[in-house]
């Protein structure tokens, strides 16, 4: 993931693969076709010139506060995945029905449809198993979205700032005699809008924080 101020481009062996302008989220580039076995030169070009009018954001471009970062913020990673892999795993809890809906994106880059087995295990963080299920799946070539609703049982533990109970879900994919997995943590909570406050699980939340300029990155 890359994070500088304006634009970054990625090249493999001198050929541009793509360009992105995101800052608040990781910038990911898919290099599967270019990274064949052997030696390659990977180049990242960071362009911090002012690309857009920034008059209203001058605190982010002058030497008095944030100034020019002149580089890359965050981790730089090159990661290898199986041809059939879990690209994304998201959890959407529902405290009223005591369930969590899992949104799973599976990539199949084998060039043809394939069958597999998806296993989902939910544990209390550092504790007992809440749910364990497996499903046979058929994957078309490319991106596949799988939606699964899982019961969390009768005695769910709710998350809030004072009792931040967490659960961990692990998704395991077996396809073409290869395995891939992804883990995330989540809390059982409901965020709603009250009359004058944001509410978590029906209770008002009093937000507090600090603004520290000129200390990032």
Identify the residue ranges that each predicted region occupies.
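Secreted/periplasmic carbohydrate-active enzymes, especially glycoside hydrolases
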Residues: 1-217
């Amino acid at each position: 993931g890359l994070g500088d101020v304006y634009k970054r481009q990625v090249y493999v062996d001198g050929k541009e693969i793509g360009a992105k302008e995101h800052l608040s989220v990781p910038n990911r580039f898919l290099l599967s076709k270019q990274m064949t076995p052997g030696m390659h030169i990977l180049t990242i070009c960071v362009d911090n010139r002012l690309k857009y009018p920034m008059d209203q954001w001058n605190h982010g471009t002058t030497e008095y506060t944030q100034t020019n970062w002149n580089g890359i913020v965050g981790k730089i990673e090159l990661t290898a995945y199986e041809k059939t892999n879990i690209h994304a795993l998201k959890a959407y809890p529902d405290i009223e029905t005591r369930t969590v809906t899992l949104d799973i994106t599976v990539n199949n880059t084998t060039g043809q449809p394939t069958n597999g087995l998806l296993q989902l295990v939910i544990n209390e963080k550092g504790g007992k198993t809440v749910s364990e299920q497996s499903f046979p799946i058929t994957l078309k070539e490319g991106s596949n979205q799988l939606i699964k609703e899982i019961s969390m049982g009768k005695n769910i533990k709710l998350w809030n700032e004072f009792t931040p109970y967490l659960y961990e879900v692990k998704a395991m994919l077996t396809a073409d005699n290869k395995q891939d997995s992804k883990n995330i943590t989540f809390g059982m909570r409901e965020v709603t809008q009250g009359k004058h406050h944001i509410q978590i699980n029906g209770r008002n939340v009093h937000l507090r924080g600090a603004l520290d300029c000129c200390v990032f990155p």
